[in-house]
């Protein structure tokens, strides 16, 4: 494991432990609200928030999580399943 200038542990592909923990916390929190929400607007807002997060996410981390699937976390039909998968993978990386 290497250290970058900020002292963050660098994992393979330039992904820091902080990056993984941040993504896990964000996805975990949004998933918990999403799975219990009965408000369609709130669920849409969560999908939008995740899409915005993905846009700014470390590209190497997204590639690792998505396994090359370009619509990962961005497809309405598979959104909840993708969030669960991302959360599990991120938890395993911590």
Go through each PLM region and give its residues.
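Generic alpha-helix initiation/capping and coil-helix boundary signal
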Residues: 16, 42-44, 79
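Amphipathic alpha-helical binding modules
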Residues: 65-94
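Short terminal alpha-helical segments
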Residues: 2-38
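Short amphipathic alpha-helical heptad-repeat segments
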Residues: 19-27, 50, 54-61
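Amphipathic alpha-helical interaction surfaces
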Residues: 33, 52, 56-63, 89-92
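Heptad-repeat amphipathic alpha-helical coiled-coil interaction surface used
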Residues: 24-27, 34, 43, 50, ...
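Charged, low-complexity interaction regions
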Residues: 32-44, 61-62, 72-74
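Short, intrinsically disordered, low-complexity terminal segments
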Residues: 6, 20, 46-48, 83
